[in-house]
Curated annotation (Swiss-Prot):
Compartments (UniProt record): Cell membrane
Residue ranges, annotated region (Disordered): 129-154
Domain of life: Bacteria
Gene3D superfamilies: 1.20.5.220, Large-conductance mechanosensitive channel, MscL, domain 1
HAMAP family xref list: MscL
Keywords associated with the record: Cell membrane, Ion channel, Ion transport, Membrane, Transmembrane, Transmembrane helix, Transport
UniProt organism field: Mycobacterium leprae (strain TN)
Membrane topology, as annotated: Multi-pass membrane protein
The protein's assembly and partners: Homopentamer.
Family: Belongs to the MscL family.
Main location: membrane
Role this protein plays: Channel that opens in response to stretch forces in the membrane lipid bilayer. May participate in the regulation of osmotic pressure changes within the cell.
Protein's name in the database: Large-conductance mechanosensitive channel
Transport among keywords: yes
Amino acid sequence: MFRGFKEFLSRGNIVDLAVAVVIGTAFTALITKFTDSIITPLINRVGVNQQTNISPLRIDIGGDQAIDLNIVLSAAINFLLIALVVYFLVVLPYTTIRKHGEVEQFDTDLIGNQVVLLAEIRDLLAQSNGAPSGRHVDTADLTPTPNHEPRADT
């Protein structure tokens, strides 16, 4: 029972997923701090007039309540930054490595098929010449005698 569970956990996909979750969590914290420290203050500076608190990115809904689109814009930028970095640092290299492995496997299969086909052709040629099939055929009996007569077309 535990051996099956161990095999399940040791598969490449589950280990890759665990690593991705840990790295993603750490990276999300880094990008969130970057967005909170740098991007959000820039958006707030551009979006909200500090004296009047009026902005196209802030909608007052009555009383002291307002819908602040600055926060939504910061979260969208945060998401885009995480998605871009994960794509370029994880997904793209992983797919390249995976395709490279598939290409090597394809070449190995192709070479194996070529060897089988060449062996079949060799055996068919040997059968049509009346010689036994196989790699170590005595070729002295199979070579034609040279024709030293002049050719008819000359």
